[in-house]
């Protein structure tokens, strides 16, 4: 049995159980002649058990026959960091000028455990450092050892 020929990939961030034919999903899929309603139904069914509105990076593989498959990844690190720090948005200023909140190193380690499948490392300590770097870029102070 031969594999289907891949026409392309679409990378989108879609809210959990919130796929609709409206932009950006509809136009992105429509350009590649994918059945938009079928994708929205399949995606919403696949993410139905998750908290509504959680942003999910999704990679949609489009095949030559206009069929598709998709892979849902874990939410972005910034989503978890904002949740742990109890803030709605990161700092718009440079790192040292305006810290908008605090997270502990243990919080970063917990996030790293959730995100390790999507990071470019399998070492939990390296993954923790990646998450701490994201926190610093958002204007969050990392406290603890």
UniProtKB/Swiss-Prot annotation:
CDD domains: Ribosomal_L11 (cd00349). The keyword Ribosomal protein applies. The keyword Ribosomal protein applies. It holds the Pfam family Ribosomal_L11. Disulfide bonds: none annotated. GO terms for cellular component: cytosolic large ribosomal subunit. One or more lysine residues are methylated. Keywords: Methylation, Ribonucleoprotein, Ribosomal protein, RNA-binding, rRNA-binding. One of its GO terms (molecular function) is structural constituent of ribosome. SUPFAM superfamilies: Ribosomal L11/L12e N-terminal domain, Ribosomal protein L11, C-terminal domain. InterPro entries: Ribosomal_uL11, Ribosomal_uL11_bac-typ, Ribosomal_uL11_C, Ribosomal_uL11_C_sf, Ribosomal_uL11_CS, Ribosomal_uL11_N, Ribosomal_uL11_N_sf. SMART domains: RL11 (SM00649). GO terms for biological process: translation. Part of the ribosomal stalk of the 50S ribosomal subunit. Interacts with L10 and the large rRNA to form the base of the stalk. L10 forms an elongated spine to which L12 dimers bind in a sequential fashion forming a multimeric L10(L12)X complex. NCBIfam families: L11_bact (TIGR01632). Forms part of the ribosomal stalk which helps the ribosome interact with GTP-bound translation factors. Belongs to the universal ribosomal protein uL11 family. This is Large ribosomal subunit protein uL11. It comes from Rickettsia prowazekii (strain Madrid E).
């Amino acid at each position: 049995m031969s594999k289907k020929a891949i026409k392309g990939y679409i990378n989108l961030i879609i809210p959990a159980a919130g796929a609709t034919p409206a932009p950006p999903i509809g136009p992105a899929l429509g350009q590649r002649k994918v059945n938009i309603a079928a994708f929205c139904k399949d995606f919403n069914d696949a993410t139905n058990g998750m908290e509504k509105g959680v942003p999910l990076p999704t990679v949609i593989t489009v095949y030559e026959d206009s069929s598709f498959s998709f892979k849902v990844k874990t939410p972005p690190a910034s989503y978890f960091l904002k949740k742990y720090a109890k803030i709605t948005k990161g700092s718009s200023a440079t790192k040292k000028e305006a810290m908008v909140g605090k997270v502990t190193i243990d919080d970063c380690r917990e996030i790293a455990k959730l995100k390790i499948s999507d990071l470019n490392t399998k070492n939990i300590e390296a993954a923790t450092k990646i998450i701490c770097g994201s926190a610093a870029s958002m204007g969050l102070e990392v406290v603890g050892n």
